[in-house]
Every structure is written in structure tokens, then in C-alpha cells.
């Protein structure tokens, strides 16, 4: 009986800790975003080589009206791809693996904490 109680307490503790880690740190994400600044901005209406990332979390793919997306990204948007945290994580880890023929030349973020942190940063720019 005691073992079950201890196990249940440990399982509950893990459930509360894991989501907190998955949320990421926006301040650390701002530093990670420095790798993105050559091509992206987080200000409304400011496109560079890549589209503005202001409001990207929750946005449909290829939805910035005044940006010329690749045909591959336009097709993903037409299929209904939405940039939720899961899709952003997968894309930012391996852009060309997730959207073959994307215009994004960046190879991807390799560290899971960098992915979580940059997404936390992007969430601060709705």
C-alpha cells in the first residue's frame, strides 16, 4: 500500500514538472532568436528574407499576406497546417524535413531546450 502511495506521489510530481520544462524560457528564447534575426522579425508587417514571426504561434501556414512563400509552404497552408507548438517544434528542428522545398535555408535547432525557448519567445509576440 505504501509503495502505491509513493509511486502515485512521484507520478504526480513528474506530471507537474514536465509541462513546466516544456514551456520554455522566453528570455533564453530571445537569445536563441538572434540566430533568426537575419531573416525574420517579430514586428507586425516587417518581412525580411523570411516572413514576420509576429503572431506565428497559432497562425495558419503561409498566411502573411504580403510575403511571397514557396509553393511548398503555400500547399501546407492550403492543407490546413497551423503553427501550433508541436508543428513549430518539428519544423524548427528540421525545416526541409517537415516542408520539403521550403525557402528556409536554416538547418534547424538541434537542442530541445532551444526549441522550447524560442517558441516561448515567439509566444510573447502574439
Named regions from a protein language model:
Residues 8-16:
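Bacterial N-terminal signal peptides
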Residues 17-22:
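Sec/Tat signal peptide C-region and signal peptidase I cleavage site
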Residues 65-82:
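Short Fe-S-cluster ligation motifs
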Residues 82-126:
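C-terminal capping alpha-helices of c-type cytochrome domains
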